[in-house]
């Protein structure tokens, strides 16, 4: 099962929940579709794209926080409140977590923290 059919919870240091309702986009179609067509993300919602080192907000209707992760899940960069019609790239990244704008600051996500996705049954 791939794409939006798969749900994950993303945990940070000390097991704290960073994204409670996160969709996994790990196929070419689900990664290309991303958050297109949505009106927004609520706190606790997100999209984990992998593999990915670059994302764009073209055709989107809302700003997002973008968390870039390396191969081991360590945060390498955070781009906050990226508005529509922008692009963000971090060549060291191997995955990207998209969150509602303001969530990265609220959660105090910083480079060096390790994030770990866990599969959710059902």
Kindly label every feature range from the protein language model:
Residues 1-122:
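Compact, glycine-rich, soluble single-domain proteins
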């Amino acid at each position: 099962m791939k794409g939006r059919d798969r749900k994950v919870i993303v945990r940070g240091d000390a097991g704290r929940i960073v994204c409670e309702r996160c969709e996994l986009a790990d196929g070419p179609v689900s990664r290309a579709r991303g958050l297109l067509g949505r009106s927004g993300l609520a706190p606790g919602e997100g999209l984990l794209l992998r593999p990915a080192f670059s994302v764009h907000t073209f055709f989107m209707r809302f700003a997002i926080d973008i968390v870039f992760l390396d191969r081991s899940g360590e945060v390498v960069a955070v781009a906050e409140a990226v508005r529509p019609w922008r692009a963000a790239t971090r060549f060291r990244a191997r995955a990207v977590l998209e969150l509602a704008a303001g969530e990265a600051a609220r959660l105090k996500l910083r480079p060096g923290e390790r994030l770990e996705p866990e599969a959710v049954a059902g």
